[in-house]
């Protein structure tokens, strides 16, 4: 290793015009460090990850969770699926109805196991964004019957243990929605009675308002172990400090994962503690593994959105994470001697109380560290020399390891997580020449590594000719590859009433509106393919299960999903159980392009074919033209999709799409 030309080692007699910062444990320690984490869900943000083939899927997981390799995350937080749209898709509930339970739906169980496989000490958190409709008894409020909601959540905790041998460490309340003190206390009591006294409650995963309620209600204060706030801008409030509870930024970042996103992440990882005394920061999301044209595309620590090609990108936020995670562990303590640098930037120091010391320094500039929210007040950062004086139990330290990153916005040739030559402290003093947009880790820890795998396959678009007949005996996941549910839940289904051509199908299984988090559509929909597709031929066998009122659709050029799914436009070809069809320009059916009689009914398989080319669309039923040349002025492109008229059972088979 070469000596970095920005490293400056001085002694007392050198007389540099440096600013001095004391690192000392004699005045006592600060708060206990709880770890850095990532969030899968809220929603469906890891949807495409599961469909990667090996070895690429395992490589991605190593970059996220393997200790001393990449991000080396200490915490994994997952959505407790609630059958509803929760940002980039729906995640299935373990209980679609109160009378059933299935602990193998979705992929969060799998992801938690993969994280634990790599790091047995990783902390696990579950948080609901939405709830199946039965929990709300037909309302949009999950707190009317707090015992029902608490038991629903505890069933998920028990399923994690009994079916996957996963011990959940923390449970949340209702993401970014109103909290209910009665429910929180009922949940605490129910957890204790079920034997989960070790599981802590995080509340309320929104703003700081719960802190005042906790000060007014000692029983609520006792029930909550962690105050979790979202996007705090690195600041806390007096009431939260007065509770004497752990303070976490339990969802943060949510920023496009280029170098500015890396600057945002590096800054808040330090300053959430320096300014706000928050001892954990969790990134939404852990990995951008969903169609990029959905909400908040690429707002993850790394990107894996092409399972069909195997391509993924280890983005710079991974290495900003490593500057903290590879040199600390939950259970370490911040020192009281942390703070801001005189010419901009910040530093934190942590110890394991066994002689190890880690100092993390960041000098991110305002323009190069803006997160998606909240707005960032102006501040200045300039080059500087910072001298750290090691005192107390650290005074004897001589050689310390140095890891360095530089986000170079001028040349574009930055440095990410590079190990430099050790720095030697002289008489307890060590100095660094700091430029802007840099991160240094100075540490006694010697186990860090910059993990590396060979380049993954090159990026390529979704296949232009794609077919799925959904025939699989023991599917590893409940969803078919690449389909991304945006309202409702579409699962592999073994059709015991048809052992011939439709024995294996894809079935929509949510039959009542969930207690929603976002504005789900009134129709169910699952998208697939390439957002740039314009001229498309889509076909699928469909089976309406609801007599008289049921209906299904096949669609092309679908231009919206996520939280905007209600506004989705495209070409939607519907058939109904009442013997009619419609072609609409939107999912809500407000703009009708064609309509008429189809002779369709429930309980019969039909083959729908939708062809869209240029400004015209044509549809057939069982191979015979049903309508043609419907004028389509917009949208110009979008995904293919399938779905149902309402929250109802329906089946799909032999899906095929050919893009021009």
UniProtKB/Swiss-Prot annotation:
Q: Does the keyword Signal apply?
A: yes
Q: Which residues are catalytic?
A: 176 (proton donor/acceptor), 251 (nucleophile)
* Keyword terms: Disulfide bond, Glycoprotein, Glycosidase, Hydrolase, Lipid degradation, Lipid metabolism, Lysosome, Signal, Sphingolipid metabolism
Name the predominant localization.
other
Which GO cellular component terms, listed alphabetically, does the Swiss-Prot or TrEMBL entry include?
lysosome; membrane
Cystine links in this protein are 264-371
Q: Report the Pfam families cross-referenced here.
A: Glyco_hydro_59, Glyco_hydro_59_C, Glyco_hydro_59M
Catalytic reaction equation(s)? a beta-D-galactosyl-(1<->1')-N-acylsphing-4-enine + H2O = an N-acylsphing-4-enine + D-galactose; beta-D-galactosyl-(1<->1)-sphing-4-enine + H2O = sphing-4-enine + D-galactose; a D-galactosylceramide + H2O = an N-acyl-sphingoid base + D-galactose
One of its GO biological process terms is: galactosylceramide catabolic process
- Which sites bind substrate? 87, 129, 175, 373
Report the InterPro entries cross-referenced here: Aldolase_TIM, GH59_C, GH59_cat, Glyco_hydro_59, Glyco_hydro_59_dom, Glycoside_hydrolase_SF
Q: Which residues are glycosylated?
A: 147, 293, 356, 413, 465, 495, 499, 537, 578
Signal peptide (residue range): 1-18
**EC number(s) given by UniProt:** 3.2.1.46
A GO MF annotation of the entry reads: galactosylceramidase activity
Cell compartment(s), UniProt? Lysosome
Q: Does the keyword Oxidoreductase apply?
A: no
Protein family according to the UniProt entry:
Belongs to the glycosyl hydrolase 59 family.
Known function: Hydrolyzes the galactose ester bonds of glycolipids such as galactosylceramide and galactosylsphingosine.
What PANTHER family does this protein map onto?
GALACTOCEREBROSIDASE
Protein name stated in the entry: Galactocerebrosidase
Record the organism.
Danio rerio
